[in-house]
Amino acid sequence: MSEESQVPSDPLGRYEGLLREWLIESGGRRVDVYYNAIHLTGEIEYWLIDRQGREQPVRPSREVRFALHDVRPAQTDPHRGAWLWSHLWMEASDGVLHQECDWMREPVIGSDPVGDGDAAFELDQFPRDPQWVPEWMAVKAAAYHKEAERRERRRQRDRERRARKKAEAAGAAEATGEQSGSDASGQVDE
């Protein structure tokens, strides 16, 4: 690893240095990175444009890929939360990382839709001002919380039912002991 990639202490600067180093080593002209994320789930695609202008999917070094995971939390905005989609790119000619982000777009991760829990956990992990909560996220988070409340009510009913059964069983055992005819002296009535 070069000294240049170790110097930046901020995640974006570190990622920029690692990506620049990898791009130069790969001999590419440009790299584009597409990052969809919500909560702890994400999908990242890297596309390299080689010197002949051909675009191809690539998989950079592990160090480059892992460094990107620190960028999103570091860029959290106190009002908008964390972005959900980002396009990062770098031209080998200038070695500067560029970025555009979207805080409102519903991420597309694989073929699975974003789950209700993902939306709720995203809001817990990266809170947002109400005007920065997209409708799709609000609907999914509300559905998750409604289901969680329903499950908690069911668990409470189950706890109460078990407690009643336990009390009934204890009462029945006590009643059975009384019905056997024993008194406090241990003598049996005849």
Residue ranges and their predicted role:
Residues M1-R54:
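N-terminal "first-domain core" detector
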Residues E3-D10, R14, R59-F66, D124-Q131:
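Alpha-helix boundary/N-cap detector
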Residues E21-E25, A74, V139, E168:
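Surface-exposed polar/charged interaction patches
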Residues V31, S86-L88:
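Short, structured motif recognition centered on aromatic/hydrophobic residues
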Residues Y35-E63, G81, H98-D112:
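Extended intrinsically disordered, low-complexity coil regions enriched in Ser, Thr, Gly, Ala
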Residues W89-S93:
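Short beta-strand micro-motifs enriched in acidic
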Residues H98-E190:
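Acidic, proline/glycine-rich low-complexity IDRs
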